[in-house]
Amino acid sequence: MKKKTMMKAAGFLAAVALLASAMPATDPISKESGATVVNTTTLAKEVRGFMGATPVKIYIKKGKVVKVEALKNQETPQYFSRAKAVLAQYEGKAANKAAKMKVDGVTGATYSSRALVKNVQAGLKYYEAHR
């Protein structure tokens, strides 16, 4: 009887470990190719474009923004492609200064571009507080 109980317990623990490892990471900061990457999917859930959330990944090396990449969203592709132009303005800037930059929205894609700017600001603020 004891052996059967121990086998059940071991199976249960293995199942729990497997499920825990399959869960998505919730930490917004990770490392990729030598860069610190901030993902705003969970950081800025309340930031909305015209059709919904507009999360980004911000790549930072040596304290400077290397790249900002828009993630999957529900924005209208035609307008969102124009809105993404604001992201290039952050590249090459020091993270602490980029977080405070004044970036204008894109005409015709105002909601989307403003949401992208707010996502970048939230991500850089988080980076500064947790690096």
Model-found features: residue ranges?
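Flexible, solvent-exposed loop/hinge segments and secondary-structure transition points
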Residues: 2-114, 118-131
